[in-house]
């Protein structure tokens, strides 16, 4: 942007000038736009070929996508930039409560040990079986996505949530001994038919799966609500609940509703043998 004398202004100077003019009722968009000029970015190192970018976008928007409706989601090798799969999946997300306070703790080394311990054991619990299709870490959250065409497989993911909940109890007892702050987590589990596509830049080596549907989104949202606002640590979607066996259904709370989550159920379940071992002092020889 230039001033009335034709001099190029910095961003701060331009904003100050606009504010001063707006104070004099200089508010119409046309008048403001007249005072803008395009800056020459030719000397900037970063380059983006926007003409080629337009062609790439149009190629993607006009390309055919071969969508296969499958019971069981195949492994990554079969997913390409030109196909997609539609299948039943169940996602589990484990999110640390009050992580902002935790990460601003002055003792960075203790926080790093805590986070490494947390992620290590969540991954150990989730990274099991042939049904896992994606596992990862998003900030302070660990997640896993499973192909679950059978009810028994959905129950297995629910069991993982209970193991995670019990493991946090073990972790906190160990943290107390090391004089490191304890943590609370929210655990979200959700099931749905999901469309999975491969996204990224073909040929760049930068790509990942994108999950389109309710399972992953809801599980992530639910993990953010667990152990918060009177919710218990484990929150599951209504569809996940409907696919639990009768024993697991009987362990859940009554049906709840939230504008962000829709209908859901929560619980604070633990694995009894694991919990007994914790309560007995976590002795290695027992």
Curated annotation (Swiss-Prot):
Residues engaged in binding Mn(2+) 1: 95, 140
Keywords attached to this entry: Antiviral defense, Cytoplasm, Lyase, Manganese, Metal-binding, Nucleotide-binding
GO molecular function terms attached to this record: adenylate cyclase activity; metal ion binding; nucleotide binding
Keyword Nucleotide-binding: yes
Presence of the UniProt keyword Cell inner membrane in the record: no
Transmembrane regions: none
Protein name: Uridylate cyclase
Gene name in the database record: pycC
């Amino acid at each position: 942007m230039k001033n009335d004398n034709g001099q190029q202004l910095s961003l701060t100077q331009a904003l100050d000038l606009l504010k001063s003019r707006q104070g004099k009722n200089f508010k119409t968009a046309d008048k403001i736009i007249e005072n803008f000029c395009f800056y020459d970015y030719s000397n900037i190192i970063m380059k983006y070929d926007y003409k080629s970018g337009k062609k790439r976008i149009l190629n993607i928007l006009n390309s055919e996508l071969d969508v296969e409706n499958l019971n069981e989601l195949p492994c990554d090798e079969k997913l390409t930039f030109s196909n997609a799969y539609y299948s039943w999946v169940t996602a589990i997300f484990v999110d640390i409560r009050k992580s902002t306070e935790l990460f601003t703790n002055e003792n960075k080394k203790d926080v790093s040990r805590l986070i490494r311990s947390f992620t290590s054991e969540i991954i150990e619990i989730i990274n099991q079986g042939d049904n896992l299709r994606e596992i990862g870490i998003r900030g302070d959250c660990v997640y896993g996505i499973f192909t679950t065409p059978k009810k028994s497989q959905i129950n297995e993911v629910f069991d993982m949530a209970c193991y995670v909940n019990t493991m946090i109890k073990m972790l906190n007892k160990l943290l107390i001994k090391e004089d490191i702050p304890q943590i609370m987590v929210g655990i979200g589990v959700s099931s749905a038919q999901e469309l999975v596509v491969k996204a990224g830049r073909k040929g760049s080596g930068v790509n990942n799966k994108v999950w389109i549907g309710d399972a992953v989104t809801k599980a992530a949202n639910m993990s953010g609500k667990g152990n918060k606002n009177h919710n218990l640590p484990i929150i599951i979607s209504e569809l996940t609940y409907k696919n639990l066996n009768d024993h697991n259904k009987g362990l859940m709370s009554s049906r709840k509703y939230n504008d962000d989550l829709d209908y859901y159920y929560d619980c604070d379940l633990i694995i009894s043998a694991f919990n007994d071992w914790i309560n007995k002092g976590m002795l290695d020889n027992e």
